[in-house]
């Protein structure tokens, strides 16, 4: 079997944007902003992110009224999952600790308060990686379909709290 290296030995191939000379592999879930400062990397960080909840208007476009609230498995189909990299329970817990149960009374309230969680998290990612100008690329700036993770703006081009932190 011929490989790219066999056919084109002068081409550098990096098999993953998170390996080989950079620091990557998340975290991709919500962590306290202090985590980024307490766990510095000595390299450019090529992949980092957290759930990025869109505004209520976008949520209403993405989910039918029967699945808009409370959070259910349909949210999981749009990347807000209990298991896996996103770990929505961490995000929900953060929202509850910061804003109380009122933040979880409706989709509209959750979307509103989630912007602050996104802003604080993404701002901390950038500020912590600014030390010694190491740099950071988030995973990812936008999604190819309506998603609740890793985006600075949503499928309908509406900015999330992460966008405000990134500028």
Where are these regions (language model features)?
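Active-site groove signature of glycoside hydrolases
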Residues: 1
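Substrate-binding clefts and catalytic carboxylate motifs of secreted carbohydrate-active enzymes
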Residues: 4-5, 32-167
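Acidic/polar loop patches that form or flank catalytic/metal-binding clefts of enzymes
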Residues: 8-17, 135-137
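Short, surface-exposed recognition loops and adjoining beta-strand edges that mediate ligand/DNA contacts
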Residues: 14-36
């Amino acid at each position: 079997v011929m490989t790219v290296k066999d056919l084109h030995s002068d081409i550098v191939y990096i098999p993953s944007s998170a390996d080989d000379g950079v620091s990557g592999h998340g975290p991709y879930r919500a962590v306290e902003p202090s985590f980024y400062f307490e766990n510095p990397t000595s390299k450019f960080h090529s992949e980092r992110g957290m759930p990025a909840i869109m505004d209520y208007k976008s949520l209403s476009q993405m989910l039918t009224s029967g699945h808009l609230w409370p959070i259910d498995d349909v949210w999981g189909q749009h990347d807000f999952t209990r298991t896996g990299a996103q770990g929505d329970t961490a995000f929900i817990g953060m929202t509850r600790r910061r804003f109380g149960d009122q933040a979880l009374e409706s989709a509209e309230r959750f979307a509103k308060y989630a912007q602050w969680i996104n802003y604080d998290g993404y701002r901390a990612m950038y500020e912590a990686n600014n030390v010694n100008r190491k740099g950071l690329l988030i995973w990812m700036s936008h999604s190819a379909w309506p998603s609740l993770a890793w985006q600075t703006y949503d499928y309908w081009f509406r900015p999330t709290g992460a966008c405000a932190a990134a500028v």
